[in-house]
Amino acid sequence: MIKSELVQIVAARNPHLYHRDVENIVNAVLDEITDALAAGNRVELRGFGAFSVKNRPSRSGRNPRTGDSVFVEEKWVPFFKTGKELRERLNPGMNDNNNGEDD
């Protein structure tokens, strides 16, 4: 699913809202999540999951074309951890023993 499909589905489920307004709402939600992550904050959508950023330290890598060794600088990468309800919907009938993680 792409963003425009999400907007269409949400607009169809909410006929009292204009398509343009739904698009603005979806964009606003995504912008807020992006801004929070850029500020180093965690975004939790209870039952769905949590977005956060993790540091990927610098390392030595290889250029796949030449095989030469290259230095890869450290960077921050987005990370998503699924929530319990989402995992249960994706795996119906499976017993989730929480895998040592708190949700």
Swiss-Prot record:
BP term (GO), one: regulation of translation
SMART domains recorded: BHL (SM00411)
Domain of life: Bacteria
Keyword field: DNA recombination, DNA-binding, Transcription, Transcription regulation, Translation regulation
Entry GO terms, CC: chromosome; cytosol
InterPro entries (UniProt xref): Hist_DNA-bd, Histone-like_DNA-bd_CS, IHF-like_DNA-bd_dom_sf, IHF_beta
GO molecular function, one term: structural constituent of chromatin
Matches recorded under PROSITE patterns: HISTONE_LIKE
Pfam families: Bac_DNA_binding (PF00216)
NCBIfam families for the chain: hip (TIGR00988), PRK00199.1 (NF001222)
Subunit structure: Heterodimer of an alpha and a beta chain.
Homology family: Belongs to the bacterial histone-like protein family.
Function noted in UniProt: This protein is one of the two subunits of integration host factor, a specific DNA-binding protein that functions in genetic recombination as well as in transcriptional and translational control.
Family matches, as PANTHER family: DNA-BINDING PROTEIN HU (PTHR33175), INTEGRATION HOST FACTOR SUBUNIT BETA (PTHR33175:SF5)
Protein name as annotated: Integration host factor subunit beta
Organism: Rhizobium meliloti (strain 1021) (Ensifer meliloti)
Gene (name only): ihfB
